[in-house]
């Protein structure tokens, strides 16, 4: 049932805000980095026809090796020479968020724990509380918990799963979605 609810929110969303946390951070090995990029590449097919923005609390620039559009990514803790870390790109992100009110917004939080909760975790909770047309999917291997008031709304979902593994499963889900559209 949880998977069906999540698929419905994903399908119905007009806009998607994606937060990337420490579960999607490189450990310096090319094997892990390649796996993360490959997992992130599962997102674009699911985002077809939707406006999206990605905020990453990581500083490894892996998100830019993915097929996600760089203009719609901010990585505030990344290298200062990277434009995605600039104040201008942060302001682009804030303007994008301000345009989500009144729209069906899906907040997809992937692997965000408590390293920097002020960047993604807490703002995503607040946005979900304020925008009644929004829903939150929180995916984390050990910290997927939701505040009680959010969990009771029926618009927030806690998925206890490593975010890389969850993204890898999206390929199967995307195929199922395409088959439903073709039927």
Locate each region found by the language model:
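Conserved catalytic alpha/beta core of Sir2/sirtuin-type deacylases, generalized to analogous enzyme cores
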Residues: 1-183
């Amino acid at each position: 049932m949880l998977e069906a609810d999540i698929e419905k929110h994903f399908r119905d969303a007009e806009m998607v805000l994606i937060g990337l946390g420490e579960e999607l951070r490189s450990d310096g090995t090319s094997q892990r980095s390649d796996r993360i990029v490959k997992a992130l590449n599962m997102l674009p097919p699911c985002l077809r026809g939707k406006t999206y923005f990605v905020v990453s609390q990581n500083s490894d620039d892996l998100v830019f090796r993915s097929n996600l559009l760089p203009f719609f990514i901010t990585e505030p803790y990344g290298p200062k020479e990277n434009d995605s870390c600039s104040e201008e790109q942060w302001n682009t992100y804030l303007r994008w968020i301000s345009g989500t009110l009144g729209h069906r917004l899906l907040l997809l939080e992937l692997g965000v724990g408590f390293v920097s909760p002020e960047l993604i975790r807490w703002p995503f909770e607040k946005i979900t509380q304020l925008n009644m047309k929004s829903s939150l999917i929180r995916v984390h291997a050990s910290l997927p918990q939701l505040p009680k008031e959010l969990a009771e709304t029926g618009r927030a979902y806690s998925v206890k799963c490593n975010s890389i593994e969850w993204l890898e499963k999206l390929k199967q889900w995307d195929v199922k979605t395409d088959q439903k559209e073709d039927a």
